[in-house]
C-alpha cells in the first residue's frame, strides 16, 4: 500500500487493481528471463512464487521461497498513520538482495507478498546487456520530434544503482543501493559506435548514471552481508568503511578521450561531491575540472539547514562549502571560468518557512538566482513521502513538520527565487568562479 499524492489517499498495491498474476519490480532482466524459462516449461504463473524482484497475491502468504516478515495491513495503514510509518520502515529495511526478507501485507482478505529484490547484475551481464544493438532513436509510436532525445542520444550510462541514500529519491527501489558498473572496454565500444553515427559531432554529452562518480559498492562487506540496516553510507557522516576510489572512473574517462572521432567527453549526471571529497587521491577532481565540464557543473546540496538535510538524508552544508572552495581553487589554477549550479529543493518535510528564509539569505549573499527550484512532491515508496503523509519520520517514529498548505509551499519556493519577485533585470548569475 502506498500514499498517492494525486488522490490524496492511501491506495492498495497495484496488483490488486491490475489483472496480473505476477509483478516484476526493479530493472527486471534476471526475473523476466527466469519467468520466461518457467513458463516455457508449462509452470502455472500462480506457482511462480520464489523469484527475487517479484511480487504476487496469495490467499495466506505462504509459499514464498524467502523468510517472511509481516507489516501492517492495508486496512491498518489506511486507518492509522503510525502503522503506515511502521510499514514503510519495514519495507525499506527489507529491500536488500542479500539479507532482505519477503514482506507480507494483508489486504482485503488476501496477502500481498513482495519478494526481496534481485541481486545486481554482474559486470559481464551488464556488458552483455549494453552490447545489444540499440538504435538510439525514439520509438516509432512518436510521430513528432522528441527534443529530449538529443541530450541522451550521445550519452553513455556506465553504472547502475546508488548508495547515496537521499530519502526523497526512489532510485534505490528501482536500481538498488548496491552499485555495479560496466567494464571500461564495454563503454569504449559504445563510444566507438557513437562515432559512426552521422549525427555525432564529436561530443559525448554525459558518461554517468544515477550518480556519475560511483563505480563499485560502497564497501567490501556489502557483497557478503548486504547493505547496513538503518544506516546510510554517506550521511550525515561518511561511514568509516566507505571505499572512496575514483581511479577506475578516471581511467574510463581517459580512454574515452582517446577514442578517434571524440572531441569532448562531458560529465553532466549528478556528481556526489561528498563522496568525491572522501577520495584522498584528487586526480579525478583535477581531471573533471580540466576536461569534463561543459561550462557549468551541477551538484545537489538541496538545502543549507542541517535539520532539513538530515530529513533529506543529505550531508550537511559545510561539506558543500568545502567542495565549492576546492572547485574554485582548481578552476583558478587552470585559468578556467566554470560555474557551479546547485540543485535546491523547497518544502521538503521538516523544512519550515524560517528554514527557507535562511536558504534565501545564502542565495542573496552569494548573488545566485536559481532559475529552477524543485518543490517537493511525494512519490510512492520513499521515506520522504511517508514523512509528508504521516508527519512522522519512519526511521525513529518522531514527529516532522510538513508544509502541506499550497500557499506556504508556493511561498517557500518563491523565497528561493527572490530576484524574480522584485523584478530585477540584472542578468542571472551563477556561482561564478571569478
Description of each model-found segment:
Residues 1-107, 115, 401:
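Glycine-rich beta-alpha loop elements in corrinoid/cobalamin-binding modules
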Residues 21, 187, 299, 373:
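Conserved, mostly hydrophobic/aromatic
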Residues 48-70, 182, 195-230, 385-392:
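Terminal amphipathic helices with adjacent charged low-complexity linkers/tails
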Residues 85-155:
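N-terminal [4Fe-4S]-dependent radical SAM core
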Residues 143-170, 203:
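N-terminal pre-triad scaffold of radical SAM enzymes
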Residues 193-341, 345-349:
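Conserved SAM/AdoMet-binding glycine-rich loop
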Residues 349-364:
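Catalytic cores of alpha/beta
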Residues 422-433:
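Single conserved hydrophobic/aromatic residue that forms the stacking wall/gate
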Amino acid at each position: 500500500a502506498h500514499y498517492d499524492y494525486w488522490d490524496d489517499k492511501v491506495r492498495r498495491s497495484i496488483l490488486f487493481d491490475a489483472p496480473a498474476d505476477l509483478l516484476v519490480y526493479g530493472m527486471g532482466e534476471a526475473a523476466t528471463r527466469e519467468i520466461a524459462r518457467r513458463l516455457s516449461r508449462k509452470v502455472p504463473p500462480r506457482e511462480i512464487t520464489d523469484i527475487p524482484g517479484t511480487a504476487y497475491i496469495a490467499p495466506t502468504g505462504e509459499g514464498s521461497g524467502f523468510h517472511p516478515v509481516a507489516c501492517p495491513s492495508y486496512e491498518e495503514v489506511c486507518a492509522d498513520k503510525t502503522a503506515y510509518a511502521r510499514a514503510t520502515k519495514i519495507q525499506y529495511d527489507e529491500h536488500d538482495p542479500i539479507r532482505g526478507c519477503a514482506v507480507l501485507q494483508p489486504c482485503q482478505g488476501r496477502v500481498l507478498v513482495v519478494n526481496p529484490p534481485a541481486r545486481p547484475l554482474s559486470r559481464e551481464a551488464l556488458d552483455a546487456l549494453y552490447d545489444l544493438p540499440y538504435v538510439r532513436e525514439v520509438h516509432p509510436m512518436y510521430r513528432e520530434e522528441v527534443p529530449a532525445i538529443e541530450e541522451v542520444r550521445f550519452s553513455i550510462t556506465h553504472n547502475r544503482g546508488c548508495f547515496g541514500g537521499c530519502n526523497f529519491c526512489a532510485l534505490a527501489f528501482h536500481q538498488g543501493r548496491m552499485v555495479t558498473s560496466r567494464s571500461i572496454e564495454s563503454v569504449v565500444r559504445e563510444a566507438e559506435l557513437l562515432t559512426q553515427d552521422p549525427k555525432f559531432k564529436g561530443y559525448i554529452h554525459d558518461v554517468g548514471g544515477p550518480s556519475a562518480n560511483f563505480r563499485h559498492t560502497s564497501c567490501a562487506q556489502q557483497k557478503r552481508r548486504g547493505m547496513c540496516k538503518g544506516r546510510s553510507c554517506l550521511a550525515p557522516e561518511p561511514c568509516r568503511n566507505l571505499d572512496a576510489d575514483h581511479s577506475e572512473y578516471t581511467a574510463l574517462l581517459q580512454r574515452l578521450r582517446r577514442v578517434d572521432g571524440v572531441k569532448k567527453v562531458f560529465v553532466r549526471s549528478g556528481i556526489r561531491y561528498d563522496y568525491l571529497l572522501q577520495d584522498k587521491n584528487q586526480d579525478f577532481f583535477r581531471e573533471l575540472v580540466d576536461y569534463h565540464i561543459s561550462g557549468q557543473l551541477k551538484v545537489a546540496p538541496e538545502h543549507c539547514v542541517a535539520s532539513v538535510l538530515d530529513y533529506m538524508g543529505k550531508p550537511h552544508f559545510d561539506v558543500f562549502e568545502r567542495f565549492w572552495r576546492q572547485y574554485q581553487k582548481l578552476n583558478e589554477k587552470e585559468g578556467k571560468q566554470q560555474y557551479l549550479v546547485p540543485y535546491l529543493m523547497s518544502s521538503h518535510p521538516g523544512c519550515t518557512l524560517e528554514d527557507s528564509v535562511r536558504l534565501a539569505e545564502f542565495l542573496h549573499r552569494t548573488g545566485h538566482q536559481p532559475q529552477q527550484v524543485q518543490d517537493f512532491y511525494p512519490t510512492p515508496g520513499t521515506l520522504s513521502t511517508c514523512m509528508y503523509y504521516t508527519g512522522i519520520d519512519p526511521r525513529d517514529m518522531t514527529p516532522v513538520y510538513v508544509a502541506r498548505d499550497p500557499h506556504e509551499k508556493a511561498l517557500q519556493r518563491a523565497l528561493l527565487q527572490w530576484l524574480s519577485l522584485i523584478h530585477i533585470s540584472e542578468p542571472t548569475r551563477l556561482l561564478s568562479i571569478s
